């Protein structure tokens, strides 16, 4: 318990240093754009790929499991849309990104720590936490709404592909179900949740990487701890935010 409280205290103190005003805005902006490409743009491929197949699989599974003469055929599209909007494209996708992006951030900062690059920045009078971590957090929070949007569209395209190429159901029925009682707030709720998840991924992973103490083995452990901790916090935040936004 004491160790956990110490960890939380160190995290809060690190975030206090991180959210200081950047000393050189031009350098910060350059680093910010670089992190957007590394953390956000480079994640588009895996987001589109996973979302496409998940959308297709959800459609097939729902069609097989709720097929009934008493159930309208468009129900498949309706349920697929709700799953993609409310949970998969925001929560589950961020859990996947926690593994990809979180381990990337933790290993990068951990390697800089064990090779004393962070110490060199401190000696030069640079706020290393602000210089290294803040661009990553801002980049993740900025790009995550686009990734969520891409995920939603990729999942819907995957659902339609099951109609066009696999003949699972009529595409007209699927389209009607996707449009039935559509509530645009569900999209905004998913984006709002993803903003919190993006902050958790970037800040928690940066904390474990920045505070590494040891050699290469410690860097590997920090990457694992970053992914596990981020995933647990995302699930907890998902529970709280879903209650607040949808309750």
Predicted stretch roles:
Residues 23-49:
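Membrane-interface helix starts
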């Amino acid at each position: 318990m004491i160790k956990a409280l110490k960890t939380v205290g160190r995290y809060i103190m690190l975030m206090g240093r991180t959210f200081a005003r950047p000393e050189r805005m031009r350098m910060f902006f350059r680093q910010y754009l670089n992190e957007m490409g590394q953390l956000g743009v480079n994640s588009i491929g895996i987001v589109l790929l996973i979302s496409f197949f998940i959308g297709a699989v959800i459609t097939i599974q729902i069609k097989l499991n709720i097929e009934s003469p008493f159930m309208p055929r468009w129900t498949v599209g309706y349920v697929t849309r709700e799953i993609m909007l409310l949970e998969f494209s925001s929560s589950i996708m961020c859990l996947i990104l926690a593994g990809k992006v979180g381990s990337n951030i933790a290993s990068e900062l951990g390697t800089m720590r064990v090779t004393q690059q962070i110490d060199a920045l401190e000696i030069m009078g640079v706020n290393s936490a602000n210089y290294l971590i803040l661009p990553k957090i801002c980049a993740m929070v900025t790009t995550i709404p686009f990734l969520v949007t891409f995920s939603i569209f990729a999942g819907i395209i995957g659902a339609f592909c099951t109609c066009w190429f696999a003949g699972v159901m009529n595409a007209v029925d699927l389209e009607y179900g996707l449009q039935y009682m559509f509530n645009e707030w569900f999209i905004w709720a998913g984006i709002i949740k993803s903003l919190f998840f993006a902050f958790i991924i970037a800040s928690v992973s940066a904390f474990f990487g920045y505070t590494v103490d040891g050699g290469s083995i410690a860097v590997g452990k920090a990457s694992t701890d970053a992914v596990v901790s981020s995933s647990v916090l995302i699930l907890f935040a998902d529970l709280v935010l879903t209650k607040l936004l949808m309750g």
